[in-house]
Swiss-Prot record:
It comes from the Bacteria. Belongs to the UreE family. This is Urease accessory protein UreE. NCBIfam families: PRK13261.1-1 (NF009751). Coiled coil: none annotated. It comes from Shewanella halifaxensis (strain HAW-EB4). Keywords: Chaperone, Cytoplasm, Nickel.
Length: 172
């Protein structure tokens, strides 16, 4: 198995690619399959979120480029800047990872959030697109709280310790 242990900023060439969802790009320990079918494992420093185009490397210089997978997302649109800002405010108030662009925002599909935004007057469509949420108000990579990832031989299990003061649940 290929063990990807480093995050790089630039390389002369890429040896392979891997397509990962947003949730997978938040993991520092994860078993993955490269686009060419090779088994690999992420053994990365904690606290980093991978993005489309991130470059990973083994200790011996084998380089893998991350591709953001298309996944089910909701995209909310409005030509009204005030209405759009209100929609983004309500999503942020619920700690929803959010990709914000001019006139539209995107989040992992949730019909309850869709209905809330439609009720506010935004147009919402469910799509299969790459999802690149904002890093957060403080530029942090973990969305305001931390998740401890414990490595085991299968690279598939993760502990779930929290370091924050507000209750919510996560599904894994």
């Amino acid at each position: 198995m290929i063990k990807l242990t480093q995050i790089l900023t630039e390389v002369p060439s890429v040896d392979a690619k891997v397509c990962l969802t947003m949730v997978q790009r938040t993991k520092s320990r994860l078993r993955i399959v490269l686009e060419d079918g090779q088994d690999a494992g992420l053994l990365l420093p904690r606290g980093h979120i991978l993005h489309h185009g991130s470059l990973l490397s083994t200790d011996d210089g084998f380089v893998v480029e991350v591709v953001a997978a298309k996944e089910q997302v909701s995209t909310a649109r409005s030509d009204n800047p005030t209405l759009f800002a209100k929609g983004c405010y309500h999503l942020g108030n619920r700690h929803v990872p959010l990709q914000v662009e001019a006139g539209w925002c995107r989040y992992q599909h949730d019909y309850v959030l869709d209905e809330m935004l439609i009720g506010l007057g935004l147009q919402v469509t469910v799509e299969n697109e790459a999802f690149q949420p904002e890093a957060g108000a403080y530029g942090g990579t973990t969305g305001g709280h931390s998740h401890g990832d414990a490595y085991d031989d299968s690279l598939e299990k993760a502990s779930h310790e929290h370091a924050h003061g507000h209750p919510h649940k996560h599904e894994h």
